[in-house]
Amino acid sequence: MICRNLQRFAAVRTLVLAALLATGLLGSTPIPLLAQASGTWTNTGSPNTARTAHTATLLGTGQVLIAGGSSSAGLLASAELYNPVTGKWTVTGSMATSRNSHTATPLPNGEVLVAGGNTAANSTATAELYNPSTGTWKTTGSMTVPRVLHGATLLPNGQVLVAGGTDATTDAELYDPSKGTWTTTGSLPNFHLVALAMLQNGRALAVDESDSSYTPGQLYDSSRRQWTPTTQMYYSHASVSTALLTNGNLLVYGNKFSCYAAEFYNPSANTWARTQRQCSNAISYGPLTLLGTGKVLLAGNAIMYGGKSFPTTNCALYDPSTNSWTLTGSLKQAAHHTLTRLLNGQVLAVGTDAELYTP
């Protein structure tokens, strides 16, 4: 099925580009192909369970925790650990609740907080803590409302900020690890599907990923427990991924276009700027991760056309110094991966298989 979809996508892309040229939307000059950069993917040990809609979290030990998600058999409560030294996976303790589309946030004490997601019955407000020392999970306080496809990020004070979700209220909430409880905080206006990211100035930035409007981002100040809008964004976004650049800017990617349509936020100036826009070898959405070189790796999950999603193995690198994208080695399999940068600088992609990227 993946091969047939990829063939269909290639044919569709040719027709799309031809149509755009014919209408003059891309101008009369040929579309520049993205340059090929170094970087390759290699297979590593296969997970015990192939999964999607899971979370991947780098632990202090250097191992990667994969939790929950969905398989061909349904929702998963299982979790496993990847050891970069051996390239092998080992099963660890299972969560109390099977879930996908949840969040996983590493805490300062080394534990990992998993919150929300879809369950067999409906969305959930439950949360659990993973202890790497014992390889076990324990339940903790539940959120004030169920959340799916929400955002979560660790604040400088050690609390976890959660916002958005498909059926959540506009209220954001805070998890206090010392008490194991949640409390509501400032309301996030008109945001439901939310991507959250921490900035170097200690504020959290929320991006609306409902693809409904060119909504300004929202900044959360933990000292005041308030949200304030940023300036207007250039694009409407969907399936958002973010990466904090070494210069302090935040790269935002994810759209329903068949082009590289990304932008970055400059906290110092409170402004948004667009990256180079190109429409060849496109990626509509996929995870981002910052490399040790200062560049950002984008691993393609899909390209959108006509309201439909087509799988892709395309990968690209964003270079902040030139504000441009270049192609890099393609994934071996289109599998809706997560991306995790390892301590050795390589990047682990996990979906229905596992691969390693060497910059």
Language model regions located:
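N-terminal Sec-pathway targeting helices
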Residues: Q7-L15
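Kelch-like beta-propeller repeat domains
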Residues: I2-C3, T14, L20-P359
